[in-house]
Design a protein with these regions (language model features):
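Bacterial N-terminal signal peptides that target proteins for export
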Residues: 1-9
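C-terminal motif of bacterial Sec signal peptides marking the signal peptidase cleavage site
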Residues: 16-19
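Bacterial signal peptide processing site
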Residues: 21-24
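Short Lys/Arg-enriched alpha/beta "domain-start" segment
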Residues: 26-40
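Short edge beta-strands and adjacent beta->alpha junctions
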Residues: 50-58
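Short, hydrophobic/aromatic-rich segments at coil-to-beta transitions
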Residues: 61-68
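A short, structured surface patch at a secondary-structure boundary
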Residues: 68, 73-200
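Extracytoplasmic substrate-binding proteins
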Residues: 184, 188, 192-230
């Protein structure tokens, strides 16, 4: 789980409860849980759930384990930009998804995305986030990128050159411009998450919003450099 939290902090990433897997709902504030202390990242709150707290089901012997990440809106104080629920893949995670669906929050405070972890296929829209994933040792999860010409990472270039080779391992698909991504390529890529940088008053993400793929809004470019790493 530590790497998931670091990745979330680093890019506000969220490989990140809501009622439907990979879907979106309105959300209330974070529920009770174990809040991780952030030394520098003031716009990010991460709460661990499980370990015998109220989410456990003693009758069924289930200890529902998941993490909740709340990203504060950097442009409007006191509001939330996005909420992410990270649920491990597998049978236990499936039960957690079902449990959270029954307990769905009705407060309309921010968009919520459920992310099954670990994320193994992602589309990364900007170079700094690609570099971050390499530094974290998560580079194999990069399966698509935008603005390839501006990504000066030799391994990304090499893997992108293999995208047409069906026998190649972990190729990277060129998804076009981050301002006008190739939706068909992204659909074919089947990413488990899309990592991008949000902007004030962007008006949403157009067709990307309709793909039902978790969009990880990483506004780390406006933070103090230390806050990008927790």
């Amino acid at each position: 789980m530590k790497k998931q939290y670091i990745l979330l902090c680093g890019a506000t990433v969220a490989l990140l409860m809501a009622a439907c897997q990979g879907g979106k709902t309105a959300a209330a504030d974070a529920e009770a849980g174990d809040t991780l202390e952030m030394k520098y990242a003031k716009l990010l709150t991460i709460v661990k759930h499980g370990d015998g707290e109220e989410t456990s089901d003693a009758a069924e012997g289930i200890d529902y384990q998941y993490a909740e990440a709340l990203v504060a809106n950097p442009w409007k104080a006191g509001t939330m930009l996005h909420r992410y629920i990270l649920i491990p893949k597998g049978e236990e995670g499936d039960k957690t998804v079902a449990m959270l669906a029954k307990r769905r929050s009705t407060g309309a405070r921010c968009t919520t995305d459920t992310v099954r972890t670990p994320v193994e296929r992602s589309a990364v829209f900007i170079a700094p986030h690609c570099q971050l994933m390499y530094e974290l040792g998560c580079q194999q999860a990069i399966r698509g990128v935008c603005d390839l010409d501006y990504i000066n990472i030799p391994d990304v270039k090499k893997r992108a050159a293999l995208s047409g080779n069906t026998s190649a391992q972990n190729p990277i698909v060129n998804c076009g411009s981050s301002m006008a991504p190739d939706i068909e390529r992204i659909i074919a890529l089947k990413p488990e998450a899309i990592l991008l940088s949000p902007f004030e008053n962007s008006g949403g993400y157009g067709k990307l919003d309709k793909l039902h793929i978790p969009i990880i809004e990483a506004a780390d470019y406006i933070r103090h450099w230390a806050g990008r790493n927790g």
